[in-house]
Swiss-Prot record:
Highest classification ranks of the organism: Eukaryota, Metazoa, Chordata, Craniata, Vertebrata
Domain of life: Eukaryota
Pfam families: DUF4548 (PF15081)
Protein name: Uncharacterized protein C1orf105 homolog
Amino acid sequence: MEKRELKTFVPKFDKIPWLSEASVVNKPLILSIPRRYRSSIVLTSYKKDMYLPHLLEDSDFISKARKNEHENLLPRNKQLCSTCRGYQEMKTLQPKIFKIPDHREPSPQNSVNHGEVSLHSQEQQLHACNDIPTESIRYRLPILGPRTAVFHRLLSDAYKTPQDTQYCAFPKKKGMSKTVKQITTPHAALYPCRSYSAI
């Protein structure tokens, strides 16, 4: 018996089709760095003789691209008010490095206070339009029937001030009568919550 070999023909690609000369001439090759980086540079090569390593080596080209991006952002910054613009600039700034003197050791209380101060300063710089006081919001549920009305009443009572609900929820304890006294006996030691009348 003869052995049969199965042969499959796979086409070989000498050149990658989307990087061929025709594609470079017809369409520009656009490489973009994702937006999460501080400054995204868009590199465009329109000529087939222009190579990417030469573009990256050219520092003037990179500085021009950064300058163009900054100029494109200026009209957006002009539309913002002064407080929002200051907040946006603060977000782009790099974090400051604080030096701790050698004779003092950093205490956890100081670090917590510093964190609270930075949080408060950021909250104050937010625009007044974004601040919605929670006291002015009235919590409402759609009333569809008697059952939802009951739940609405329960939920609206929950949003009242705690002082109002505290008096209703926890009634004051009545004074115990003078005749009832607690006796320390072995049985009373086992059940301390029970009170025994005097004999």
